Amino acid sequence: MAVWLPAQNKFYLPTQPITKILSSDDYVSRTNIFYHATSDRLLIVGHPLYEVTRANDNTMTVPKVSPNQYRVFRVRFPDPNRFAFGDKDIFDPETERLVWGLRGIEIGRGQPLGVGISGNPLLNRFDDAENPSRYNNTHATGDNRQNVAFDAKQTQMFLIGCTPATGEHWSIARRCAGTQFQLGDCPPIELVNTVIEDGDMFDIGLGAMDFGSLQANKADAPLDIAGTVCKYPDYIKMGQEVHGNSLFFFARREQMYLRHVFTHAGIVSEKEKVPTSAYIAAKAEQPQNTIATDNYFVAPSGSLVSSDVQIFNRPYWLQRSQGQNNGICWRNELFVTVADNTRGTTMNINVLNKATPETYDSADYNEYTRHVEEYELSFIVQLCKVKLTPENLAFLHNMDPTIIDSWQLTVSQPPANAIEDKYRFIESLATKCPDNVPPPTPTDPYKDLRFWDVDLSERMSEQLDQFPLGRKFLYQSGLAQRSVPKTVNFRKRRSSNTTVAKRRRRA
């Protein structure tokens, strides 16, 4: 008996074609000309926990310089199209434009290794949950804040790109319409992406979150991050960026272990209390009859700081970026995002506040704390060319129109056949509005963001062998080989006694 059955296999239609993003190697050609650029010694000094301001007008007197802050350097290179090259065949200004391509970088860090301290004299540290000596269930009342400090999670990282790096953190979200909530309910949270700016805090082991909007008591976090935002680089989003401008490559090393386990004081909401099915009730006379708080938190520690695991003070060579941009520095600038708290030493300074005392008294001295940081940036850049074809210009315009604007490309206008009218006092109310509005002045797309500007316009050199990073690049790439010293053989000098003996024999 024949029975008809429907086909069991499924048919898959081809996906819709997507716009192909070209690699920079497809429209950028490289020359054999390399330049070395290095910055000055970059120094910064400030208070490690907070910004010091003048009491009467809130004017900043000492900046906040924490070892747990990002340092974002905006490096500006000179425009290669304005260079006066001796060789006229390097490029044709009518059909080509010059750009820089990153080939090597070394981030130098000064100052000795040291462990930084992060703490709060009024930290919401209720009880020890690691080795408790008694059952404490009085977390819902009183002021139990204590003076607690710890060393943060150890972090070393840097990110290189021609646009600022993107960070992520958790912040308060908008409640849905029609949602019933009461005062004291936990707000919804969402993942937020923002630009990592100079001076932003990175994660110290307590999470990447907006502590200002999610911690109203200002006591659940150390002073340096209380009321601020801790950001973590969004490697996933930057890795999926279509043009690959924000992240050419990166290096990171993070480590942490749990030093102590504490609890926070405060009322545990009835909506999120420990379910009765998770425990067996205690007797009425037992203190365990009232459940203690389950609001645990850890005191992190970055552990040992060693020079064996340093990612700085060494060269990095760029052969192939992880994205489509293979190291081309559009708009002649580069963003170097650095996070390093392995040199987080807090300097303690004390000064006499009265005449020389006869006996020691703490009231005779004023105590101050400072933190210092030292950087030096070195680069090897390669001269590259972009042909001004319609395809290349259209692609670059879709990626970033300001790139073409900075090249000052002009289009020839057709000759005018008729006479034109030219008004005097065209800006006055007596005449018509002007027809041709002057082009707007180019604005900085990052004018509202904080960066450490490093201008290398006058610090470029073609003599690579005169600089440490340049010599390393020459030897690594094989562009120049140091000749091996010739071996010199010295004849062994005969002693005078042997020579006299031979003369006597001949005689």
Curated annotation (Swiss-Prot):
A molecular-function term among this protein's GO annotations: structural molecule activity
InterPro entries attached to this UniProt entry: Capsid_L1_Papillomavir, Capsid_L1_sf_Papillomavir, dsDNA_vir_gr_I_capsid
CC terms in the record's Gene Ontology section: host cell nucleus; T=7 icosahedral viral capsid
Localization of this protein: Virion; Host nucleus
A Pfam family hit: Late_protein_L1
Alphabetical keyword list: Capsid protein, Disulfide bond, Host nucleus, Host-virus interaction, Late protein, T=7 icosahedral capsid protein, Viral attachment to host cell, Viral penetration into host cytoplasm, Virion, Virus endocytosis by host, Virus entry into host cell
GO annotation (BP), single: virion attachment to host cell
Listed HAMAP family: PPV_L1 (MF_04002)
Membership in a protein family: Belongs to the papillomaviridae L1 protein family.
Subunit structure: Self-assembles into homopentamers. The capsid has an icosahedral symmetry and consists of 72 capsomers, with each capsomer being a pentamer of L1. Interacts with the minor capsid protein L2; this interaction is necessary for viral genome encapsidation. Interacts with protein E2; this interaction enhances E2-dependent replication and transcription activation.
Purpose: Forms an icosahedral capsid with a T=7 symmetry and a 50 nm diameter. The capsid is composed of 72 pentamers linked to each other by disulfide bonds and associated with L2 proteins. Binds to heparan sulfate proteoglycans on cell surface of basal layer keratinocytes to provide initial virion attachment. This binding mediates a conformational change in the virus capsid that facilitates efficient infection. The virion enters the host cell via endocytosis. During virus trafficking, L1 protein dissociates from the viral DNA and the genomic DNA is released to the host nucleus.
Stated name of the protein: Major capsid protein L1
Protein's organism: Human papillomavirus type 63
Encoding gene, per UniProt annotation: L1
